[in-house]
């Protein structure tokens, strides 16, 4: 009976509006004003009684009114559906866009049930202000209220009892009690929705103690006729005043009197008022009862637009929907869209009111409708246990003038529409493509279904043009809808670099099905690309630009303007017949197809021109490369000739030395012979110097060649062959003569196999004071220092030679030295476990700098270090590199390429000849290359612990000589002449030798894990070998036994323990979907989710940041797979479990 009284006033005004809408609206407004004068309704209390999901649109905004939903409210209030004899109104559309003129809040005087009275006026056009008000209504959230709600029990409604208030609610809402009193008590005053004051006594007593409302409560229960099951709401407003509200339990209505209007008459009144207002654009009044109505039927225009054009609905789409729970709580339930059809295809055809058929995940969660409207749901594209949070980038700040009003409206209404999503590029793991909205990202895999949906939606609007009641509104609305859809599609094309541009243009403009995706243009235009080698083909594919972004945008805008202009030109008038309208639609469709085909041809032509230009550019580059290679080959052949001439000159010098030594007694008797030999030597030197100058002139133009051409592997191969020939000749000459000689060599390389090296007992230490040095500190020892070894009697101690004849010095480390027949006794066991080291020689008459160091770019495997403090710049007094080498080829940074500082010997100053008794005047040139196997096998720690012992065991030289050698080497390499160093004692100075180097320590090689980490909340992480198991069931059984949850992972309950894992592509998936072999190959770590975590994710739709605040670390490395470290930001809830999944 109470519900009937509540609906009597709306029904009466609706029937009157059918006869005269304007007069009924005026009377209703007058009646509401009179009622409002009697009792003002508190807005906070009204909304609290209405429910947490009810939000009334603001006055002056645009709304969408659905008569079908209004009729459902009448049926729900009367507990009776619409009868078949209720007439239909064909001129009444399924929805009306109206301007909200007024909203009045009311409450039933008998039941205290709340309802609202709204005055609406249909509009065909609307201004900017109304649209802005609708937009702002979505942004402005309703302020949080301090309240509590309790469902009354039988003891609460008894006349001799009191109202038991929950402890936390009493402490939060009520004023604090004075606990010094016994018992603590106070008097409270509260106002109901009709502004009536009620007085209660609040006392804290009982066993156990509890908060009670005693005196005055029985009067309130009897006055409001409350029963068990009803709910009482207590609100504390801004002025700290208490407000009382009532929510009645849903009960069957009592028998309705025959004098009351029947439900059929009420249906007729509602529909008649709406039809009259739509036909005359006149105001009409409706009543909205949030407690009786299944759902809102007056929707804010911005909310409707956002839901309709931002969500592309398809069958099988997952969604979540908010529902009200007990005591004014809310909860989201997950569901699936199972169908899209009209709720009432006879009366309301093509209506969007509850046209989605849905199925719910939890069948026993309460009574929920099997049909919903699109603006009531939130579509989701990922399963409930996935969280897309790591893929979000930082929001780019936008200005108000950057985008259109409608786009800003959507993004402000739903903030996650403006979030940007980073999509990983499958070709390049380091590159991302930000700037994609979440809606577009969710709908990437549904392009075909969205195309069909858009085509059907556009055809629906085209068909609506024939409706006389919608002629003025449909054209305006159609242009706006096309504009919004085109903008969304345009963003898709631009963000994906337009690889699917024709397909999306077909969706937007109904193109022909013969459109060719642009990612196939390369194979159509130039099929010969497949015959090229893989490198050039890949380079061409990467360099192809499908279409510039600005050009793609301009093409889409052009097509959009054309469609809108044609729609406006072809807008039918009310006097046109249906046949002419159909003919215009057909003509418009053909024109669109012709224009789109022309756009496709222009795109194909542009792609062909760009491809031809790229091919021409590549041919020019190839020609230039071939020309440069030819010049380098010629240069290599000329240098080989110089090597032969140098060898001849060395032989002559050797002969001269032998003749001087063997015929020292007969020098005065044979002067003509000596003069003849000297003349021959002088001629050879002149010829050699001329050849050097010619080679230098030919090599100067090669400095302009790109660095990529200098690394051509052809030249090192030719030079290595020539160097090996030269080395063989020199070794054979040394063996024959038996006397160490000094060659003048233009090469600065030492063979990898290790040639014959002449070892001398004499050492030479030279100071370079003419030029700045790159060493850490300048040398202080001046003059020449010699140490004579008694064992090397066949070696000659030579004085410093003039710059024209001084040799080029390249000292080597221990492993580069291989013993000659002369050194068999000295070095019987060469150690091959020590990596080679190189120190650059010094050039004469050249300015210091990184370009003056020796370049090893001709080697296939070089050594490199950055800014080594032990590398020295050239000096005049240290020796001569042959004049045929230009200074531009000497690059310090390329010299130490691929070096590992912590596993190799320190470089030695070229001015120091005391490297294990090696005389720099008797050194030959050998190519130095990096031993790859040695680098991988050497361990830095082992090397540091045993270097001195290995040197002592493998190279048993004299102690005095070694001490002198070591001291000189350290002083010259590190600039510390007073450093104590003794290589004989392996227990000291190893750390000083290795740790005081100027090269930075190389990072330790990261070990590859062969076991998979498993995490579970509240437990220490474990590591398992996935390869041990044969399938998912065995793995689940092992994990359950490992973490003590046996029998809980194998059951099939809907909400229980879940296993998820992260694969090699950083995607989080549910365990058990992929084949077992693929899972074993791609799994990186596994996560066990508890039922509470699964339930929390089903509520929120994702794995929030506060689900796992305290995750235990793994026992192996102390790193959490779901968080960077356990002790990092322990109190920051924003550090979610998915921030770093590694």
Swiss-Prot record:
One of its GO terms (cellular component) is nucleus. Expressed in roots, culms, leaves and young panicles. GO terms for biological process: auxin-activated signaling pathway; regulation of DNA-templated transcription. Residues 1009-1093 form the PB1 domain. Its main location: nucleus. PANTHER family: AUXIN RESPONSE FACTOR 4-RELATED, AUXIN RESPONSE FACTOR 5. Homodimers and heterodimers. Interactions between auxin response factors (ARFs) and Aux/IAA proteins occur through their C-terminal dimerization domains III and IV. This is Auxin response factor 5. The gene is ARF5.
């Amino acid at each position: 009976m109470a519900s009937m009284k509540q609906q009597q006033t709306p029904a009466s005004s609706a029937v009157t509006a059918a006869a005269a809408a304007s007069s009924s609206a005026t009377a209703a407004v007058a009646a509401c004003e009179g009622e409002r004068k009697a009792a003002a309704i508190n807005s906070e209390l009204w909304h609290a009684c209405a429910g947490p999901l009810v939000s009334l649109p603001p006055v002056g905004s645009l709304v969408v009114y659905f008569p079908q939903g209004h009729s459902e409210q009448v049926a729900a209030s009367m507990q009776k559906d619409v009868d078949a004899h209720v007439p239909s109104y064909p001129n009444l559309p399924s929805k009306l866009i109206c301007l909200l003129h007024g909203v009045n809040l009311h409450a039933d005087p008998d039941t205290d049930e709340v309802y609202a009275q709204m005055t609406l006026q249909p509009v065909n056009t609307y201004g900017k202000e109304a649209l802005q008000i609708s937009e702002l209504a979505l942004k402005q959230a309703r302020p949080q209220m301090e309240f509590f709600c309790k469902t009354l029990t039988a003891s609460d409604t008894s006349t001799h009892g009191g109202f038991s208030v929950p402890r936390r609610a009493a402490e939060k809402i009520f004023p604090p009690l004075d606990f010094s009193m016994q018992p603590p008590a106070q008097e409270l005053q509260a106002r109901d929705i009709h502004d009536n004051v009620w007085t209660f006594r609040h006392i804290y007593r009982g066993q156990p103690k509890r908060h009670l409302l005693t005196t005055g409560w029985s009067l309130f229960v009897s006055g409001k006729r409350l029963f068990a099951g009803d709910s009482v709401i207590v609100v504390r407003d801004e002025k700290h005043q208490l407000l009382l509200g009532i929510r009645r339990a849903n009960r069957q209505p009592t028998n309705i009197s025959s004098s009351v209007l029947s439900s059929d008459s009420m249906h007729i009144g509602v529909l008649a008022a709406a039809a009259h207002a739509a036909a005359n654009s006149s105001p009409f009044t409706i009543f909205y009862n949030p407690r009786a109505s299944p759902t809102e039927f007056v929707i804010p225009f911005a909310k409707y637009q956002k839901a309709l054009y931002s969500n592309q609905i398809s069958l099988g789409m997952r969604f979540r929907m908010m529902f009200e729970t007990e005591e004014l709580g809310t909860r989201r339930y997950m569901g699936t869209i199972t169908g899209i059809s009209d709720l009432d295809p006879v009366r309301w055809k093509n209506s969007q009111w509850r046209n989605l058929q849905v199925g719910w995940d939890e069948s026993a969660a309460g009574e929920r409708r099997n049909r919903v409207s699109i603006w009531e749901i939130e579509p989701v594209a990922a399963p409930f246990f996935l969280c897309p949070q790591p893929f979000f980038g930082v929001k780019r700040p936008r200005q108000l003038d950057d985008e259109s009003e409608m786009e800003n409206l959507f993004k402000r209404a739903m903030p996650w529409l403006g979030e940007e999503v980073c999509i990983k590029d499958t070709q390049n793991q380091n590159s991302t493509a930000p700037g994609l909205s979440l809606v577009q990202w969710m709908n990437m895999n549904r392009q075909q279904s969205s195309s069909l949906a858009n085509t059907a939606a556009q055809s629906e609007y085209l068909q609506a043009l024939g409706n006389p009641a919608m002629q003025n509104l449909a054209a305006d609305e159609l242009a706006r809808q096309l504009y919004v859809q085109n903008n969304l599609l345009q963003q898709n094309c631009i963000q994906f670099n337009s690889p699917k541009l024709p397909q999306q243009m077909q969706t937007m403009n109904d193109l022909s099905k013969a459109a060719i995706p642009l990612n196939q243009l390369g194979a159509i235009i130039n099929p010969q690309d497949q015959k090229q080698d893989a490198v050039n083909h890949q380079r061409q594919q990467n360099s192809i630009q499908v279409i510039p972004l600005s050009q793609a945008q301009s093409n889409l805008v052009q097509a959009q303007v054309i469609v809108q202009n044609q729609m406006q030109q072809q807008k039918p008038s009310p006097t046109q017949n249906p046949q002419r309208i159909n003919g215009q639609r057909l003509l418009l469709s053909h024109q669109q197809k012709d224009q789109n085909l022309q756009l496709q041809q222009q795109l194909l032509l542009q792609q062909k021109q760009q491809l031809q230009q790229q091919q021409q550019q590549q041919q020019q580059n190839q020609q230039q490369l071939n020309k440069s290679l030819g010049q380098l080959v010629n240069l290599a052949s000329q240098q080989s000739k110089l090597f032969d001439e140098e060898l001849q000159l060395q032989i002559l010098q050797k002969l001269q030395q032998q003749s001087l030594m063997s015929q020292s007694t007969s020098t005065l008797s044979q002067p003509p012979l000596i003069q003849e030999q000297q003349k021959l030597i002088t001629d050879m030197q002149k010829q050699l110097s001329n050849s050097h100058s010619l080679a230098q002139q030919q090599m100067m133009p090669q400095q302009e060649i790109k660095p990529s051409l200098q690394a051509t592997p052809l030249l090192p191969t030719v030079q290595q062959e020539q160097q090996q020939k030269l080395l063989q000749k020199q070794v054979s000459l040394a063996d024959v003569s038996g006397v160490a000689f000094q060659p003048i060599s233009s090469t600065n390389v030492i063979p990898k196999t290790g040639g014959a090296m002449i070892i001398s007992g004499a050492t030479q230490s030279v100071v370079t004071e003419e030029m700045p040095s790159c060493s850490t500190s300048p040398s202080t020892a001046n003059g020449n220092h010699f140490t004579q070894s008694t064992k090397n009697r066949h070696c000659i101690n030579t004085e410093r030679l003039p710059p024209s004849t001084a040799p080029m010095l390249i000292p080597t480390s221990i492993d580069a030295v291989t013993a000659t027949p002369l050194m068999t006794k000295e070095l019987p066991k060469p150690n091959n476990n020590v990596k080679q080291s190189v120190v650059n020689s010094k050039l004469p008459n050249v300015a210091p700098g990184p370009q003056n160091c020796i370049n090893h770019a001709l080697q296939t495997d070089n050594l490199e270090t950055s800014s080594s403090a032990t590398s020295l710049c050239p000096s005049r007094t240290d020796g001569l590199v042959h004049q045929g080498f230009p200074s531009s080829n000497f690059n310090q940074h390329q010299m130490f390429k691929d070096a590992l500082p912590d596993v190799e010997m320190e470089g030695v100053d070229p001015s120091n000849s005391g490297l294990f008794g090696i005389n720099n005047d008797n050194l030959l040139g050998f190519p130095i290359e990096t031993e790859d196997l040695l680098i991988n096998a050497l361990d830095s720690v082992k090397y540091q612990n045993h270097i001195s012992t290995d040197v002592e065991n493998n190279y048993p030289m004299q102690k005095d000589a070694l001490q002198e050698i070591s001291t000189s080497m350290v002083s010259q390499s590190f600039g510390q002449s007073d450093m104590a160093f003794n290589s004989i004692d392996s227990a000291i100075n190893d750390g000083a030798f290795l740790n005081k180097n100027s090269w930075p320590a190389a990072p330790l090689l990261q070990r590859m894990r062969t076991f998979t980490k498993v995490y579970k909340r509240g437990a220490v992480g474990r590591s398992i070998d996935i390869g041990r198991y044969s399938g998912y069931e065995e793995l689940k059984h092992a994990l359950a036994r490992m973490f003590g949850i046996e029998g809980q992972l194998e059951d099939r309950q809907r909400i229980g323990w879940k296993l998820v894992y992260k694969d090699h592509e950083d995607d989080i998936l549910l365990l058990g979907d992929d084949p077992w072999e693929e899972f074993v190959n791609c799994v990186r770590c596994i996560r066990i989710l508890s039922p509470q975590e699964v339930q929390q994710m089903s509520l929120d739709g994702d794995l929030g940041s506060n689900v796992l605040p305290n995750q235990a670390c793994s026992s192996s490395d102390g790193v959490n797979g779901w968080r960077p470290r356990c002790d990092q930001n322990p109190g920051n809830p924003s550090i979610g479990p998915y921030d770093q999944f590694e």
